[in-house]
Regions:
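Walker A (P-loop) phosphate-binding motif
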Residues: 126-172
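Flexible active-site lid/hinge loop adjacent to a nucleotide/diphosphate
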Residues: 184-261, 266-267, 272-290, 445-448
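Glycine-rich, highly charged phosphate/nucleotide-binding loops
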Residues: 63-89
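Charged, amphipathic alpha-helical linker segments immediately N-terminal to NTP-binding catalytic cores
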Residues: 85-116
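ATP-dependent carboxylate-amine ligase
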Residues: 1-66, 79, 93, 164, ...
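Adenine nucleotide phosphate-binding catalytic loops in nucleotide-utilizing enzymes
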Residues: 222-229, 233, 259-351, 450, ...
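A short helix->loop->beta-strand "cap" motif at the edges of active sites that frequently abuts
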Residues: 34-36, 118-121, 239-244, 261-264, ...
């Protein structure tokens, strides 16, 4: 880390998306180490800085948020700022650029970034900083679906190990902590949720332990299935014979890849109990007997990784009932007029929505919609038609895709979430479920941001007989 800091000294450093969770924490790291010549960029206007910062730092109390924002303004004052219309001005003269994982998504807005990238200016991500420089034992959790939940479960279990546990993910409720990287020792544990975009700017060291939840053809609007697989599996392929890969045996893609890995492979399986290591096979039985446990795969993955620490007390099922799960993932928000409302808006793929429906059963009205990311939805449509009371779609790419396969009388389309929830409530029977699970991307941006939250809509519902 010292060499990296010296490398940065006297360089023209540019930080993109500085009001975000990644950008603001990178700036904190730079200022903490007394690095000068920093230029900060954000597409928001200067009078929107506070609003944007607080939007991207959700998972803390209001008091903590105010304190963090005050510190951020102090850091920002020590940089040259390029906001609003000045966004990315001078980026082509940078010596090094720190970018958030999302920068490639906004091609039109970030054209100057692409020019700088193609020019050969080094781009660095916060994930690469963790992987390359953290002294802690790193557990990287990746996969198409369930990586955030698995990482969060793992954090809660390992906090009982007596070792200091650091955890950060892709969500706005988790704080980044690259500014604390120099505090981490080899006796500490750093748990990272890692998406494919976080690997695109490279890394020079793979985690000692990688947990791979599953692999599905996702993000096909950005890259091909083969390229997605190549990037997604780069973590486990870069591991050495001294590392461990915790692999979902139920994924044929991962199963085929696992036989060619240099690392030591541990399988976990919700379908084949005998494929789990002996020390956690009884956990499989426990989970199958608990009908309320809707994330069996994630719990098995976390316990399989935990087994590598060879501490029997950490493998107790006593932890399971007290586990906290991430918000907006099969979260029971409310029961009204004997109808259960579930918030699952973090489900941005058809596979995670289908899994939610398997857990809830066919007495469920599904509300979904969003950007399809180039995914083939035929299997999803067949499954949901057979396993739901009714499908309600919000007008989007997904509703267009569904319309290609089924006539309009098979489903209903609404322009706004409030209308969809009102309709779902009206047609639901006693002890039935309403599941808001997008199965596609940008649901929050398109249907919730700047509008009423799901909870607020539910609260405003009149008695069902009056609708």
């Amino acid at each position: 880390m010292d060499k990296f800091i010296e490398f940065l000294r006297n360089k023209k450093i540019h930080v993109v998306g500085v009001t975000g969770a990644e950008g603001s924490n990178i700036l904190r790291f730079l200022i903490k180490h007394k690095l000068t010549g920093v230029t900060t960029h954000d597409c928001v206007k200067e009078n929107q800085i506070e609003q944007s910062f607080k939007l991207w730092h959700k998972g803390i109390s209001q008091t903590e948020k105010e304190k963090l924002f005050k510190g951020f303004l102090a850091d920002l004052s020590q940089s040259h700022t390029s906001f609003g219309d000045k966004y990315l001005i001078g980026i082509d003269h940078a010596d090094i650029v720190f970018t958030p994982q999302s920068w490639r998504l906004y091609k039109e807005r970030n054209q100057k970034l692409w020019v700088a990238y193609k020019k050969g200016i080094p781009f660095y991500s916060i994930t690469r900083m963790y992987l390359d420089y953290a002294k802690a034992q790193i557990i990287g959790v990746t996969g198409t679906v369930g990586k955030g939940s698995t990482a969060y479960i793992l954090k809660q279990i390992l906090e009982n190990s007596g070792r200091k546990v650091y955890f950060t993910g892709n969500e706005t409720w988790t704080l980044q902590m690259v500014d604390r990287i120099d505090e981490m020792s080899k006796d500490d544990i750093l748990i990272l949720e890692i998406s494919h975009r976080q690997l695109l700017d490279g890394f020079s060291r793979a985690p000692n332990i990688v947990v791979f939840t599953n692999l599905f053809p996702n993000h096909l609007d950005e890259l091909s299935w083969d390229k997605y697989k190549e990037i997604k599996t780069s973590l486990i392929k870069f591991q050495t014979k001294d590392d461990y890969s915790v692999i979902n045996y139920d994924s044929s893609e991962l199963r085929n890849i696992s036989v060619r890995l240099r690392s030591k492979v541990l399988y976990f399986s919700a379908k084949s109990t005998h494929m789990n290591i002996k020390s956690i096979q009884y956990i499989t039985t426990y989970l199958k007997s608990n009908k309320n446990m809707h994330i069996t795969d994630n719990v098995l993955a976390a316990y399989s990784a935990t087994s590598l620490f060879q501490d029997p007390k950490l493998l107790s099922t006593d932890f399971i009932p007290s586990l906290l799960f991430l918000p907006a993932r099969m979260q029971l928000l409310s029961t009204k007029s004997s109808v259960n409302f579930y918030d699952d808006i973090k489900s941005t793929t058809p596979w995670s929505t289908m899994e939610a429906l398997r857990k809830l059963g066919s007495n469920t009205v599904l509300i979904c919609g969003g950007h399809t990311k180039g995914i083939n939805y035929y299997d999803f449509i067949q499954f949901t038609e057979a396993n739901t009371r009714k499908i309600i779609l919000l007008k989007s790419e997904l509703s267009t895709e569904v319309g290609k396969f089924f006539p309009n009388d098979k489903f209903q389309v609404y322009d706004c979430l409030k209308e969809a929830i009102f309709k779902a409530f009206k047609i639901s029977g006693e002890n039935e479920n309403i599941l808001v699970s997008p199965a596609a991307a940008f649901f929050y941006t398109d249907f919730i941001k700047g509008k009423d939250s799901i909870r607020k809509i539910i609260t405003s519902l009149p008695p069902r007989e009056l609708i």
